[in-house]
Amino acid sequence: MDLEKIVNKGINELSPYEPGKPIEDLERELGIQNAIKLASNENPVGPSPRVLQMIDKVLKDTHRYPDGNATKLKEIISRKFKVNSSQVTIGNGSNDIIEFIARTFLSTDDSAIYSEHAFAVYPLVVKAVGAEGIEVPAKNYSHDLQAILKAIKNLSLIHI
């Protein structure tokens, strides 16, 4: 069976993610020590003692499935920002939320606009759902809002 024939065209056009080199490899190749790697959104100082305490506190319950709706967290966020908890969406990081948005609002007949210096996930999720991605050149390393307006045609989503 040829999987490429049955897989969504947008998925077939994606390239696999290539993670950055492990810090150990980089130090060995460059002959350096104590490098601080920031490229992969890693924290060079590790978790705070408070975070470690909280992890220890909840560790005893890790054999149970968590609340898939994140009810308590949604309630806390909704109170803090004075919105209804139904207006709060929880995901596993920004990539997850961006993918929810693309899957909800885009299809193969749609397009999405993003700036050339926008988050790298925007074009990936647009392509994955088979929509047309429209990359608008930046102006002085900023979003060119006038160019974004001019690029609008059959638009479904703008990523800023």
Give residue ranges: language-model regions.
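N-terminal "arm"/small-domain region of PLP-dependent enzymes with the aminotransferase-like
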Residues: M1-R64, H143, L149
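Conserved beta-strand segments of alpha/beta enzyme cores
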Residues: N34, Q87, E132-I134
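Hydrophobic residues at beta-strand termini and immediately following loops
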Residues: L38, Y65, G91, V136
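Phosphate-binding glycine-rich loop
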Residues: T71-S111
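Conserved PLP-anchoring active-site segment centered on the Schiff-base-forming lysine
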Residues: T104-V125
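Short beta->alpha connector loops at strand-helix junctions that form conserved
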Residues: E116, E132-K139
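Conserved small/polar residues in nucleotide/adenosyl-binding loops
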Residues: I158-I160
